[in-house]
Amino acid sequence: DGIFLAGGDQSRYVRYWRGTPVGAALDAHVRAGKPLGGTSAGLAMQGEYLYGAMDGGSQISPRALADPLGADNTIETDFLHIAALKGIVTDTHFSERNRLGRLIAFVAKGESLAGRPLIGLGVDEDAAVAVEGDGTAHVYATSPMAGATVVKGGFAKQAEDEPMQAKRVDTVGAGPNSVLHLPSGRVDRPVFQRHYAV
């Protein structure tokens, strides 16, 4: 049997399921090789590090980048423990809501908590990422431009109360003809490879 996590308010998942038998049951379900899916908040909750939306809203890229370590970037962890998503920060509605900037900030905040490099995985609304037990993943899309974006972390330490500073942020696009390898973030046959300064 598969389990599908609905969209909605992801802070409720964090508040009501973290550290409970429900969270443990989801982990056991995945460890048993059974499928776990989700959309919107239900996908955002699956990474090792995640935006918990504990600030009561939905963070936008300019505000997230203005203070990546700030309190509004409510990055949570210790929710689900999915091996293929270890070291990954997940985000949704990616291209549609211009969330590249916020995912970069979320990765930076997650790295400040983890003390190690992380990667970001942003998924567009018209796409799904299906991850096999060995971590290989494929993108399925209902729109020709939809897919997933990997943000490579390993950023320099960010300063408290200061805007994001990164001389180079590497991103890689995965589409239906790509193979994504998790948790490494390597993409075979990428749709694009782009670099940004923030």
Q: How would you label these PLM feature ranges?
A:
Residues 50-52, 56-198:
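C-terminal and late-domain segments of enzyme folds
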Residues 2-4:
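N-terminal Rossmann-like NAD(P) cofactor-binding module of classical short-chain dehydrogenase/reductase
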Residues 19-33:
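Catalytic-core regions built around general acid/base machinery
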Residues 10-20:
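Glycine/threonine-rich flexible loop motifs
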Residues 10-11, 43-46, 128-130:
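Short, active-site-adjacent cap segments at secondary-structure transitions
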Residues 6, 30-50:
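Catalytic nucleophile loop
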Residues 13-14, 47, 54:
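Glycine/Thr-rich phosphate-binding loops of Rossmann-like dinucleotide-binding domains
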